[in-house]
From Swiss-Prot:
Catalyzes the S-adenosylmethionine monomethyl esterification of trans-aconitate. Keywords: Cytoplasm, Methyltransferase, S-adenosyl-L-methionine, Transferase. CDD domains: AdoMet_MTases. Belongs to the methyltransferase superfamily. Tam family. This is Trans-aconitate 2-methyltransferase. It comes from Sinorhizobium medicae (strain WSM419). It comes from the Bacteria. Disulfide bonds: none annotated. PANTHER family: TRANS-ACONITATE 2-METHYLTRANSFERASE (PTHR43861:SF1), TRANS-ACONITATE 2-METHYLTRANSFERASE-RELATED (PTHR43861). It is found in: Cytoplasm. GO terms for molecular function: trans-aconitate 2-methyltransferase activity. The gene is tam. HAMAP family: Tran_acon_Me_trans.
Length: 257
């Protein structure tokens, strides 16, 4: 799946706020390297750099366009291309930080267990994942894909990612790994200019697998049909703007010393 750093950063302030909220719950780190997993264009990496300057920091991402943007933004740092599903975390690491990436990997709890085992005592795994598959933005992606004009392009392939496990599932699995764990949900209400802005937002993330599945000639038609549904689902407020409701799941697991 191809990503666009330019599309993603159209809403950089809104996308970075959850990373700030996640990092605020990481109180201190032991000695050792820190990693921004799924670093994207480097917006979250910059937050970590400014907070924990004594820990060598590396950004990891699977997309070359995102890595190019991150290297331009933070030329003093190291950025590596890797698939997180198979990436081997270095032992005695101080921080694994992951803002909005592991929702794309269905077996991510197994990966969390692997990351925790690579933490130094006192090290932290900090994760934020969108938990918005039941929101109109994502329900309508699937409804549009099922329309007769587009259904053939999606036959035999799943564009929709899997739902997240329950919070209890994370707690039960991860506490067995000798960590202190904190799990919570936050619902953000983003004030966007209009319904078209919502479409532009999800074009940078959730819509990517749907658009990638379609032939280029049919993407504009899909976007038009989807945008029409979004305008009906998100009513305009008195000032002309719309509210985008966005639930996110946070997990902070710190290895016991």
């Amino acid at each position: 799946m191809a990503w666009s750093a330019a599309q993603y950063t159209k809403f950089e302030d809104e996308r970075t706020r959850p990373a700030r909220d996640l990092l605020a719950q990481v109180t201190e780190l032991p000695d050792g390297p820190a990693f921004d997993l799924g670093c994207g264009p480097g917006n979250s990496t910059e937050l970590i750099l400014n907070r924990f300057r004594d820990n060598p920091l590396t950004g990891i991402d699977s997309d070359e366009d995102m890595l190019s943007a991150a290297r331009t933004r933070l030329p003093e740092l190291r950025f590596e291309k890797a698939d997180l599903a198979s990436w081997v975390p270095p032992a005695e690491s101080a921080l694994f930080f992951a803002n909005a990436v592991f929702q794309w990997l269905p077996e991510h709890i197994v990966l969390f267990e692997r990351l925790i085992l690579a933490l130094a005592p006192g090290g932290t795994l900090a994760v934020q994942m969108p938990d918005n598959l039941d929101e109109p933005t994502h329900v309508l992606m699937e409804e549009t894909a099922e329309e007769s004009a587009f259904a053939s392009a999606f036959a035999g392939r799943a564009a929709r990612r899997k739902s997240l496990p329950s919070p209890a599932n994370y707690v039960e699995r991860l506490t067995a790994k000798d960590v202190r764990i904190d799990v919570w949900h936050t619902v953000y209400y983003h004030q966007l200019a209009n319904a078209n802005a919502i479409v532009e937002w999800v074009k940078g993330t959730g819509l990517r697998p749907y658009l990638d599945a379609l032939p280029a000639a049919r993407r504009a038609g899909y976007l038009a049909a989807y945008a029409d549904k979004i305008r009906k689902a998100y009513p305009t407020m008195k000032d002309g703007r719309v509210l985008l409701r966005f639930p996110r799941l946070f997990i902070v697991a710190t290895r016991n010393r």
